[in-house]
A protein has these predicted regions:
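Residues at the C-termini of beta-strands that transition into short coil/loop
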Residues: 29, 53-55, 75-76, 94, ...
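PAPS-dependent sulfotransferase catalytic core
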Residues: 1-69, 71-78, 103-104, 109-114, 218-269, ...
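PAPS-dependent sulfotransferase catalytic domain
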Residues: 59, 74-92, 99-220
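A structural signal for well-ordered alpha-helical segments within the folded catalytic domains
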Residues: 30, 34, 95, 99, ...
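Aromatic-acidic/polar surface patches that form glycan- and anion
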Residues: 18, 26-29, 33, 83, ...
Length: 270
């Protein structure tokens, strides 16, 4: 049943949602998240959207889920989830992790190619400078140690580490666990998430929003911040073709093994 204080059309009462049942969208990069965020933000109204869209916007002990908002959406940690009202609706979206890795790579490459020389010299664009200067294999595995940590945190079985630690860059916390232990920890934490949708099943998200909140969103087949290739194109083979060695291809494929097993255990299709 929809919450009685919400409308049955395209919008929802953001004040009521903030007090009773905020929406929490755990946005994993390159999973159609900007499209979903835009639709939900329009539904609840901009002033009811948490300003924290990435974990880096809340340094130190600052909350990533500050109280009083109807929508929490972004590349954020979710360690504070239980501080929100008990009627919250928490969800995330997964896609084939190999396609996510490749999509992320080609998206960053496209962004880097659009920067001028001065912009590429800025510290915050160091990774984009490297993606232009290096082969794909060197980008993923060429170091130095600090950049390797960035690569591992964002590409190496990210679904497992994000769900297991509830943090965008929580992977170091798992260093003493076996792959099986990491997977079990991730699976255990999914009990705190109401729905996990495949990227191919966003129609169910639309239906769930309508049923739960009496409001309508349209996200199926609409993609914001898409990469340079057509949506129906598989990016993974194109990325593998840029990896020169068998060892490099095997190492890159290992970045998706745990996530593929996680999706299989969850019954979420790729």
């Amino acid at each position: 049943m929809p919450i009685s204080s919400l409308t049955s059309q395209a919008s929802a009462n953001g004040t009521a949602l903030a007090a009773q049942s905020p929406i929490v969208f755990l946005h994993i990069p390159k999973t159609a998240g900007q499209t979903i965020h835009n639709a939900l933000a329009a539904m609840v109204g901009g002033r009811h959207v948490s300003p924290i869209r990435t974990h880096t916007q809340a340094p130190g002990d600052a909350p990533q889920m500050p109280a009083g908002y109807a929508l929490y959406s972004g590349h954020i940690d979710w360690t504070e989830l239980e501080t929100l009202p008990g009627g919250r609706f928490t969800f995330t979206v997964l896609r084939d992790p190999r396609e996510r890795i490749a999509s992320f790579y080609f998206f960053l490459l496209k962004e880097a190619e659009a920067l001028d020389r001065d912009a590429l010299e800025r510290p915050e664009n160091h990774g984009k400078k490297l993606i232009l200067q290096r082969s794909a294999e060197e980008y993923f595995f060429g170091g130095p140690a600090g950049f390797n940590a960035f690569i591992r945190d964002h590409y190496d079985n990210f679904y497992v580490s994000y769900l297991a630690t509830r943090k965008m860059r929580g992977r170091p916390e798992l260093r003493d666990l076996t792959a099986a232990q990491r997977l079990e920890k991730a699976l255990a934490n999914t009990s705190h998430i109401d729905r996990i949708y495949p990227i191919s099943g966003l129609g169910q998200l639309e239906a769930d929003i309508a049923a739960r909140f009496g409001a309508q969103i349209s996200v199926t087949g609409t993609y914001v911040n898409a990469g340079p290739m057509a949506r129906e194109q598989s990016r993974w083979p194109k990325l593998l073709n840029r990896i020169a060695t068998d060892r490099g291809r095997a190492d890159l494929e290992a970045f998706a093994e745990g996530d593929l097993e996680l999706m299989e255990r969850l019954g979420v299709s790729t």
